[in-house]
Curated annotation (Swiss-Prot):
Domain Protein kinase: from-to ranges: 77-331
Biased composition (Basic and acidic residues): 10-34
Entry keyword annotation includes Cell cycle: no
Reaction equations catalysed: L-seryl-[protein] + ATP = O-phospho-L-seryl-[protein] + ADP + H(+); L-threonyl-[protein] + ATP = O-phospho-L-threonyl-[protein] + ADP + H(+)
EC number: 2.7.11.1
Protein name: Probable protein kinase DDB_G0291842
Database matches in Pfam families: Pkinase (PF00069)
Low complexity compositional bias, start-end: 38-56
Keyword list, A-Z: ATP-binding, Kinase, Magnesium, Metal-binding, Nucleotide-binding, Serine/threonine-protein kinase, Transferase
Annotated ATP binding sites: I83, G84, E85, G86, S87, F88, A89, K90, V91, K106
Length: 352
């Protein structure tokens, strides 16, 4: 087994403490913002330029520019409340008047006329189309444009995201202050399966982090938000949240291995529940293979520590691949258990 990393990497513990310790100080900071009033129907003003993207792909996902529609697509939805917000868009929970089902509808914060910004939204739509349906991917259903705003109708994952789960673990009375390890392995199984599908389609996500890992109604973890991702042949210079960013992206080296690092540091956060650094010496240490774990903490197995070290290897050419990750002994046993449990559940549904 590989030795544990140099514990002196984080000699000053003042900046690297558990979220449970800092929870009271950060209470106001972590509180969800008040939900603003949502628009009833988006304006129907004509767009300046129709988006140039396929109107339909093999998965059946459609994109409609205003010139191709006879009425506002937004009028097909009842907007219930805002459930998320990013740099470029807000996400609403909405009920379709067509089928009565609930969806997530993402709306750009402002009309998108600037080319690079439009291209980023188009990229998210096209990659969603390319990925199609997968159990561990938040599916894109449809997209359209109104008044310069871009809308994306997606599968609703209303049980929150992994960041929410980590915060709840901190607040749990008498708990570990973090997720139990058996749960971490189950979540890793979901994420790894989804990421394998993403890479098989020739796409790099480039923004794997807890906020972009969403829980479906049945508790399955799904990868969402493909607004930053790039194709493996595209030579794009996109990069996501620097807290989870792979070190080689600083040198404009874009490979699927960057997603493995981001997943590895996400796994590290899940296992330790440390507040990860955004910059400075601690940030650099984590990207130089100096990965400290809490001392005298037997809640983190050696299997999990070893895997995190493999995933966060500073050399992207030596980092474990998604194929090898799925074959990792411990993860294989979890995958087998999940499959057998799922099969048993389906049989019970048929019989009873």
């Amino acid at each position: 087994m590989r030795p544990l990393p140099d514990q002196s990497a984080f000699e000053d513990k003042s900046e690297l403490v558990s979220k449970k310790q800092k929870n009271e100080d950060e209470n106001n900071e972590n509180r969800s913002p008040e939900t603003p009033r949502t628009p009833k129907v988006c304006p129907k003003t004509p767009t300046k330029t129709p988006l140039r993207t396929p109107t339909k792909n093999q998965a059946g996902v459609q994109f409609l520019t205003q010139k191709k529609r006879t009425k506002s697509c937004s009028s097909h939805f009842e907007y219930i409340n805002q459930i998320g917000e990013g740099s470029f868009a807000k996400v609403y929970k909405a009920r379709s008047f067509v089928d009565g089902r609930l969806y997530a509808v993402k709306k750009s914060k402002k009309p998108i006329w600037e080319t690079s910004e439009r291209n980023q939204h188009i990229q998210e739509i096209e990659n969603g189309m390319k990925l199609g349906h997968h159990n561990n991917i938040a599916q894109v259903m449809c997209a359209w444009e109104e008044g310069g705003h871009i809308f994306i109708q997606m599968e609703l994952c209303e049980r929150g995201n992994l960041k929410d789960a980590l915060n709840l673990a901190v607040q749990e009375e008498g708990g570990l202050g973090k997720l139990p390890e058996y749960m971490i392995w189950q979540y890793l199984c979901d994420i790894a399966n989804g990421l394998s599908h993403v890479h098989e389609k020739g796409i790099m996500h480039l923004d794997i982090k807890p906020e972009n890992l969403l829980f479906s109604n049945d508790g399955v973890l799904k990868i969402g938000d493909f607004g930053v991702c790039s194709t493996t042949t595209g030579g794009d210079d996109s990069e996501g949240d620097q807290i989870y960013m792979a070190p080689e992206l600083l040198n404009d080296i874009h490979t699927p291995s960057a997603d493995i690092f981001s997943l590895g540091i996400t796994l590290y956060e899940m296992a330790t529940n440390y507040n990860l650094p955004q910059k400075g010496q601690w940030w650099r240490n984590l990207r130089e293979g100096k990965i400290p774990f809490p001392e005298n903490d037997d809640s983190i197995s050696q299997d999990l520590k070893d895997l995190i070290i493999l995933m966060m290897n500073p050399d992207h050419t030596k980092r474990i691949t998604i194929q090898s990750l799925l074959k990792y002994d411990k993860l294989q046993s979890v995958i087998t258990l999940k499959r057998s449990t799922s099969t048993l559940y389906r049989l019970q549904r048929k019989l009873f």
